[in-house]
Amino acid sequence: MAKVIGIDLGTTNSCVAVMDGKNAKVIENAEGARTTPSIIAFTDGDERLAGQPAKRQAVTNPEGTLFAVKRLIGRRYDDPMVTKDKDLVPYKIVKGDNGDAWVEVHGKKYSPSQISAMILQKMKETAESYLGETVTQAVITVPAYFNDAQRQATKDAGKIAGLEVLRIINEPTAAALAYGLDKSEGKTIAVYDLGGGTFDVSVLEIGDGVFEVKSTNGDTFLGGEDFDIRLVEYLVAEFKKESGIDLKNDKLALQRLKEAAEKAKIELSSSQQTEINLPFITADQTGPKHLAIKLSRAKFESLVDDLVQRTVEPCKAALKDAGLKAGEIDEVVLVGGMTRMPKIQEVVKAFFGKEPHKGVNPDEVVAMGAAIQGGVLQGDVKDVLLLDVTPLSLGIETLGGVFTRLIERNTTIPTKKSQTFSTAEDNQSAVTIRVFQGEREMAADNKLLGQFDLVGIPPAPRGVPQIEVTFDIDANGIVNVSAKDKGTGKEHQIRIQASGGLSDADIEKMVKDAEANAEADKKRRESVEAKNQAESLVHSTEKSLAEYGDKVSADDKKAIEDAIAALKTSLEGEDAEDIKAKTQALAEVSMKLGQAMYEAAQAAEGAGAEGGEQASSSKDDVVDADYEEIDDNKKSS
């Protein structure tokens, strides 16, 4: 049976794991690392890079390098968070045809789901090269506080990447699964998950294989990226103070500053001070300018203090919704790379009144939990029951624009709730229902998931028709709606037409694009391999020709030289088939050279053998003297 992989699709880094026997195993990528940067780059030559190779060239290609795209997934272009991000990233964020936030590189638009799919493809390839078989099914994690549009967009990304997404699972829940799989005694735990782009906190009761989420809360626009941005802003301000030059509009300098900020942030988790050195950051008429700033841990903590404190409110809300006090939490599990920051650990300890648990790898535990959930769905992992919750209330807009809740937040999923609606006017034949998700009292302040029309209602006085609408949230946290006219018994399955999101046709087109790209990538790889082989043959043939050219006829020598010239010309192009054909032609004509080399070697060996014979015949003239050893004792007797 083919394996189901678990993928932690992160804002900054992604990770893939698979069940290996009874344990989840994190798979190393082609570069030998256990996590892969969630970065996609398009070079000037239209080559697509993913992961570490994309990150390495970011400084020289800021506009073509896409990072932290997860922050845009499922968001509208006019979302205030998108507007904020637009000014901070070097690449272009544009309005998609559906009104969502998309990105643009080299004049081509991509949806965040497409870019995420490219990262998922990289993770899929990583798993396939380890398992030695094709992977088609996956469990993908999302922040617990993701809304329906963001979950749907993540599922779409999986589909574009050629994966059947068996389950979308919340990151803190996945982490709890990996943490508590081998623990039999009952515990109440809090998972504090501060990653690259999002923050979640979940309260769970675990024991005897049952993982029940009691509540969840969070902030989908708070993470390590914000800490980096805060540090970049500080460095820009300090440099301006010192040199009078504003680096804000220099995309190349900003990319270098971002890399340096991330590095400094990581270093300050283990040391009290670091130095940021960026030579030749810019130049003016007086010459090149260098940036050199010493940064202490205390200074960094003061710069990001409000960001750290922003994690406290969701913790309070999660405890309140679970009906618990901080002292009733048995263990606090830290997840996400940002939880390595000492200040974060201090705040967690102060809030929960206990030392946080550090026995899990914060970068890998989510992917491991996803792999375990994959094992559960496949039947390989027995006696595990996962009860998750919906993070946000679901409801509709009623008279006066009020938000009427149908399913409250922190309701265990899957769940179903029905409500009967009627008409507002006589002989009304259609009703428009607008579905929202959120916690505000007015519908307009919440996230519009979409709207649908119930049509074909038989003519009747207002208030008479009885239309039962059922809202159903599946185990992925994705909303489905069905409606039934009680009078006629007619039932409609209604798909919410999201206000944005990708249509089936969009997804189909993107799947085809991804397949075409995979084919193009394969061709490009074949071309590179063919070039490497050809260059190696040219080099070795030229070397042999210089050494043994006098051993072949003038015609053969010319044929070899012509074949080398033809192959060199072919190497200037990208036609892999032509390169292969010319390589084969050179290999064939250079066989004469190989023969000459072989004959020369044999002749040298023959000469060596003759010399050896002469030496042995002269040896025959030497007579070995016989001698007898006499014992000293015998001598004296």
From Swiss-Prot:
Coiled-coil positions: none
- Induction of its expression: By heat shock.
Bias-annotated ranges (Basic and acidic residues): 516-529
What PROSITE patterns does the entry give? HSP70_1, HSP70_2, HSP70_3
Pfam families per UniProt: HSP70 (PF00012)
MF-aspect GO terms:
ATP binding; ATP-dependent protein folding chaperone; unfolded protein binding
Indicate, by first and last residue, each region the UniProt record lists as having compositional bias (Low complexity).
601-617
Q: Where is this region: Disordered?
A: 516-542, 601-637
Q: Does the keyword Nucleotide-binding apply?
A: yes
Residues that bear Phosphothreonine: 198
SUPFAM superfamilies per the record? Actin-like ATPase domain, Heat shock protein 70kD (HSP70), C-terminal subdomain, Heat shock protein 70kD (HSP70), peptide-binding domain
Its keywords, alphabetically, are: ATP-binding, Chaperone, Nucleotide-binding, Phosphoprotein, Stress response
- Purpose of the protein: Acts as a chaperone.
Name the family the entry cites: Belongs to the heat shock protein 70 family.
Task: Tell me the protein's name.
Answer: Chaperone protein DnaK
Q: To which species is this protein native?
A: Brucella ovis (strain ATCC 25840 / 63/290 / NCTC 10512)
Gene name as annotated: dnaK
